[in-house]
Every structure is written in structure tokens, then in C-alpha cells.
């Protein structure tokens, strides 16, 4: 399994949506993915609504978030 770093998937740029974390190459906030999942919507619906985000990027971003959280709890 290839390791993905945050900058490969999620970026922050003050010129893009005021610097909130977005998927690289898009204006789609990472928070939008979390909101969809929190609301009980499937990943497939998020990807359908935001076609500029690939399945691979969404899964990689979730893996990064999981790793970060688990790392903080250790």
C-alpha cells in the first residue's frame, strides 16, 4: 500500500476559499466530505455531487484523517 501525504490530497491556499483545506486541484472543502458522511450519505453520493474529487482522493483523505486522529490518541 502506497503512503499518501496530506499535501498530495488536501491543500490549503489563502487564495482558495480563504485557506480552508480543500482537495488538491479543486475548490471542494474536505469538510464537505465529512459533512456528507456524518449526515449518513454514502461516499458514492459525495463523489456524484463533486465529480472533481476522485474516489482515490476521497479515500486517501479519510485515511489521512484516521491516521492523524489515531496518532493523537496514542
Locate the predicted segments by residue:
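Intrinsically disordered, low-complexity and often Lys/Arg-enriched segments
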Residues: 1-6, 73-74
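Long, charge-rich, low-complexity alpha-helical segments
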Residues: 28-74
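A short, structured beta-strand/loop element
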Residues: 4-44
Amino acid at each position: 500500500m502506497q503512503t499518501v501525504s496530506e499535501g498530495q490530497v488536501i491543500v490549503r491556499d489563502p487564495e482558495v476559499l480563504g485557506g480552508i483545506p480543500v482537495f488538491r486541484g479543486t475548490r471542494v472543502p474536505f469538510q464537505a466530505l465529512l459533512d456528507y458522511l456524518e449526515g449518513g450519505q454514502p461516499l458514492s453520493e459525495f463523489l456524484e455531487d463533486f465529480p472533481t474529487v476522485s474516489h482515490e482522493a476521497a479515500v486517501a483523505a479519510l485515511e489521512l484523517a484516521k491516521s492523524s486522529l489515531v496518532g493523537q490518541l496514542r
